[in-house]
Amino acid sequence: MDITGDSATVDNKGTMTVTDPESIGIQVDGDQAIVNNEGESTITNGGTGTQINGNDATANNSGKTTVDGKDSTGTKIAGNIGIVNLDGSLTVTGGAHGVENIGDNGTVNNKGDIVVSDTGSIGVLINGEGATVSNTGDVNVSNEATGFSITTNSGKVSLAGSMQVGDFSTGVDLNGNNNSVTLAAKDLKVVGQKATGINVSGDANTVNITGNVLVDKDKTADNAAEYFFDPSVGINVYGSDNNVTLDGKLTVVSDSEVTSRQSNLFDGSAEKTSGLVVIGDGNTVNMNGGLELIGEKNALADGSQVASLDLPLY
């Protein structure tokens, strides 16, 4: 379906399947467009489900959307003041992008469930000045994926739902200056190896942590010993003149393993995990809330395996 003209409205209540590279299920070229997707959409092999080229566009997705494969995109808006409302389920795999909102003063509101997995996969990508991102849904990110990729200046990010971040993945990656980030999540759980909950890179950003953040790498995973010394982090802040305030609860769980080496120089190894990392000049950290550090002992099945991985003999 291809519509050209301003103030168009499309109500899609049926099933949409896009399987051909560079094919588009619904395309609207014009300003003030509204597209309502209430049915089930499946986009694979480099296709795009809904694409709106124009300003003041709105896409409302309340159905079930599955997006798979490199260059595949579920919903894309190219224009200023675009709004994407997610109130259904979104599954993104194989390097696909669930949502792309490209333009200034764009908004993405998620109230639904988002599952993102596999290298290069991004649940929501937004790029433009003055962006607004709001999440009150449940988000699960794993296997080298990114939940939200946000590039903006003077934007606003509010996370009030729940999020779980698995192996080698990032829940939210924010790049830009003078942004406001409110982390009021009821549960942000960083459970994967080399995983990051929230990554903020830029200057003069404000980060308020009012919810619950837990960093606890899964010690029962098959790769737990291999990545024992590689840190997982709750919140990373890089740049200058940033302001970070902890009013919520930040919990970090770290395992220690009683180990031995042939040289008998090492009798223990500590797992690397971090709750909050702030790097740069002129940054301010206000600790008003609860910081809880929990130690575990011998949570891995074979602690002797750990010491042989990274620690050198002297």
Go through the PLM ranges and name each one.
Residues M1-Y314:
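Long, low-complexity, polar and repeat-rich extracellular regions
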